[in-house]
From Swiss-Prot:
Record bears the keyword Oxidoreductase: no
Name of protein: AP-3 complex subunit mu-2
GO terms, biological process: anterograde axonal transport; anterograde synaptic vesicle transport; clathrin-coated vesicle cargo loading, AP-3-mediated; intracellular protein transport; intracellular transport; synaptic vesicle coating; synaptic vesicle endocytosis; synaptic vesicle recycling
Keywords: Cytoplasmic vesicle, Golgi apparatus, Membrane, Protein transport, Transport
Domain MHD as annotated: residue spans: 176-417
Amino acid sequence: MIHSLFLINSSGDIFLEKHWKSVVSRSVCDYFFEAQERATEAENVPPVIPTPHHYLLSVYRHKIFFVAVIQTEVPPLFVIEFLHRVVDTFQDYFGVCSEPVIKDNVVVVYEVLEEMLDNGFPLATESNILKELIKPPTILRTVVNTITGSTNVGDQLPTGQLSVVPWRRTGVKYTNNEAYFDVVEEIDAIIDKSGSTVTAEIQGVIDACVKLTGMPDLTLSFMNPRLLDDVSFHPCVRFKRWESERILSFIPPDGNFRLLAYHVSAQNLVAIPVYVKHSISFRDSSSLGRFEITVGPKQTMGKTIEGVIVTSQMPKGVLNMSLTPSQGTHTFDPVTKMLSWDVGKINPQKLPSLKGTMGLQVGASKPDENPTINLQFKIQQLAISGLKVNRLDMYGEKYKPFKGIKYMTKAGKFQVRT
């Protein structure tokens, strides 16, 4: 299946490679570099690239390309999902997944990759099992290993490897028993210049941090589970219970994990939390243009919109911009023609605005179309789809755990046409 794995930074340098079968020459990545040059952005590189003797499958996360090399046809999503699992494992082990961190922990990285694949086929991909096989690096363990010459490889077989719940090790004990769940929704939308919604959808996840003693059995119920589409679960979830009762029943892994991901595509269920009033005008035979935008809240259930950043790619004919923001700071790059306005929080009583003039090339024709406006924002304690957790119950253990639910909505690809 997977012959080799190459890690490539955004500059095109291969800084780590791992081979499970025969060694594949680095020259195979030349096909990937050619595709990278053709793509305008890193995210636009094709995930599957055929070559005369191999297939290259890649994911781009944390400014790193994870490129798998295979020689036989396999389901592409199978390989791509494994690559995402590799990234998540690195993040779980080291806190962050970045080029410097991977280089600093290169021995542990190779040990983890050796356990995750056996002769090119996925073997141990659960973080709990991997942490028993390969101990996560700590300052103390690094010092001890340096002095004694030992490694991070565990000296015992994982207790959960052969059990019916391989994602959870046995004998887990905590002084404070707690279970926290984060409902995070990302809204993608296109708004036309009249303010009507062209398309809108929500991608959501529920991330969990569970630190419970023993072998607890949890059930999580929702107030309105029917609005969830295209749901994908962690293997711990009992699917038949969800199909029949729309209740999540599971024995959780120990620590951090993603319980489920879901999709809300019905546009009548997608509320648009912000609006943009805009007035952008270019005149023929004039060296000046007018620019004015105002951002305000809409359908936020009284929650504050924060972390607002407005960006817009201006036409090539714009030489400079003289703008005044009512709040926040703005920048305009005359080379890339990119306007960026860091708004911060939106106060409903005093809506933020950015207005002024644009300097245009003398004699240049009027642009064919106005620029689009892209928004970034986040709203704490709000799931924009209306999803709400009803209750969390625990069975199989007698103690009473601490429980908490947190909601957050953030912008994905949120575009306003002008």
